[in-house]
Amino acid sequence: MPQRAAPLPTTPPAPDWPVLLAIAGLAASSAAASLHAFTAIVARAASLARDGGPISPSSLLPALGLTDGLLAGLTAILLLAVVWLEWRRRAVSAMLWRANPTEMWVLLAVLLLWLGHSFCFPGVLLAADSGSHIARFLEMSRGFQAGFIPQWTNYQYLGSPLLAFTGPLTYILGGLLTLAVGDAVIAVKILATVVHFLTGLFYYAFLRTLGLSRSAALVASVGWTGSFAYLQMFLYRGLFPQLITVMLLPVLFLAAEHLMRRRRTGGGYWLLFALTTAALIVNHQPHAPFAAIYLALFGGISLLLGRWRWAGLVPMATAGLTGAAMAMIAILPVLEGAGWVMMEPDSGLALLRWPTTERLLRLVTWANTRSNWGSDYWAYLGIASVALAVFGAWTSLSGSATAHRRSIGLAVLPCVLLGLVLYNPVVRDIMFLGFFIGLLVALAIEGLLANRQAGHRIVLVALMLVLLDVASTAILPVARADKEFLAVAGRYLQSTAPNERGIEIGIQRDGSFQANTGPSAGVMSYFATPQRVSGHHNMAATLVHNYSGTSINLAERDLRWTGRLSTRTATLLAQLNVSRIVCTDPANMGCPETFQDASPEGPLGRRILVPDASPVLFSRSLIALSPPEGLDKPALWDPIFEFEPMAPRVAAIARFLHLYLDTAGIDPVRHTARALPVRQPPPGTTTDPADFEAVPVLEQYTVSLARVELVIAARQAGFVQLAHPWYPGNEVRINGTVTAPLQGAISLLVLPLDVGRNHIVIEPRTTPMTRLAAWISGTALAGALAVAGWLAWRNRRRPEHVASGDMA
């Protein structure tokens, strides 16, 4: 009968640095090998695709060279060294069993950095929403460079709010980082790598706060932050703001644990809970209520089981309310302006949705490429992690489990079940499901550690199963280094046509094409700021969105069926100040030969010039015209434009646009209209369609990130429609006097013109509601600091008592 292994010392005199250095070297060499080799392979594949050559293992092999061989050899040597150390003296398994604090932190750091090295592949990030966030990082940095926090961008959707209708925290951090490094793509990669690393550390710290062992916390942290379900949110879905949300979740629960289990309320943890609550709301408002629901369920069960103290409810509730008050700067302005943009009031409400078999299988079906679309975010969690989670649920409820472990399991299991059904289209629900699955994984390791018959290598076996499961999905070379032609085109447009707009059409390899109506941004907006009719965040687009998007779609349909723009479509685009339609395919700029009016222009290749584009449309009179109900909102998403025949709402908007043209009677050459259609003409306004004796002259027109400036000379009084959206959150000044603009029929600005020189400036304004929100947030922050200071002073000489479990 084999003898049980002799007990190992629980605390060695010093960390086993040779083993740690060997593991760190193995991680570094393997990461370098994958970065170098996959970068070369992707570049080779892109070159073959561009030239029409076959892509196969044999055709890709020549991409590898001497450096790849040396790195692979070094990796093999270090791997053998680690295996030898384990075989000769059980070095790795002993490390995991005794769980020396220094060894665990170093090992965790090495593994987290390795699991996040896919963020560091050279090239630009293209997947899904990546471009939208990179473009916003760039725009934020431009504002910071000019000395202000930008609230508005004129480069997207004819002009739209930049921060108010999305979580501003990530964009402020990303903008500052972009300003520091000078490159928005590099800033995103740095942010993703650092926050991914911190997420694993904070998750580990939270599990330790629960009283779970270091080995259990290590395996669970690696399993969650290395899972494809986690990484695909960022590498394949480009959901970079949710990096911060995922990072803050364990911090929120960690602070709650301390508040609810200590007899004395610590000022630091009270402040940490308040700040984390505020940060969750400010980063992405819809995720904060979901975090609160899960915390309430987890905490409610912990209270009923006696693991949490009822007396802790008051400090946690006050900290949470204080955090919500601090976040008013990201709440009240949204409530005020929701009717001015495409955001829907119920977009953040919690819903229940029963999971289908297909979605459940996706959690355990191996994948290393994008496997979900739209508002579905479930992806492969890892078969090893899920198996351990099932074992963890069973062992935590078995008769051999300690009371402490059982209480954690009973609090976690309902959260896992809730994670299967709680849903909202704008909430990335996989982060909550993965968070609690990781807790069950930790409980599984606790169960293995409690079984001394399993031997000292059982934790190593579990860790290796998890690592082997996540390793193949952690190496995801999604960055591309063959898109410089797009960056060149973007810089060209910024320098050549800074005050004009463009439309982008994507050409597929099979010759099909689709116009970009958003929400998205491409490499042309990564390093430059050309003006676009589409944009990067459609919920923040103004009420002109559906009309401009349908105008783009009409242009696409014209080009598909006739190869050229119709006169009416060209007129619609011209009054939006669209001067160019540019085309891109996977390898080049340039429109196809079927676009009959396209001609070459430098780095843009063949492009279409839209005749008579202008930011102004003049008239002597106004006429009432309002769209039927249901055309302004809700927002049209890009798939609806591809329906054949036209989707009913798109067709209704197209009919209204034609009615708008007929009513206005636009002369695109003179930039005049018989009458400007507005939704509510002022009382006494003339409807006489008299023409100008002399058409007003646009003497100056400049557009920057958050400011539009025009100078119009008029010999007769009249009106001007600007190719900028009506938005009450902006301020319009004419010759220094604040002027209330009229809302045009398609929600463009309409202003009066006086005889003489009209100097017009459009800039964001600070509304009374925003000032109130800032005052509440500032007061709450000051109050939170004062309360935390008082609590710290009060507790300085009083020892704290932990209710149960190891909080070290």
Stretches with model-predicted labels:
Residues P2-L493, A497, T562-L565, V578-C583, ...:
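Membrane-embedded transmembrane-helix bundle of lipid-linked glycan/lipid transferases
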Residues L295-L297, G337-L349, R480, A515-T529, ...:
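Short secondary-structure boundary/capping segments
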Residues Q285, L332, A338, Q508-G511, ...:
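Short loop/turn segments at secondary-structure transitions that flank enzyme active sites
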Residues V82, R501-I503, L572-N577, V582-A808:
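Flexible, solvent-exposed extracytoplasmic
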Residues R4, Y526-V578:
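Luminal/periplasmic acceptor-recognition loop/helix of membrane-associated glycosyltransferases
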Residues L169, S385, G506-Q508, D585, ...:
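Short, flexible loop/turn elements at secondary-structure junctions
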Residues W114-H117, S141, V461-M539, I640-P645, ...:
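Extracytoplasmic
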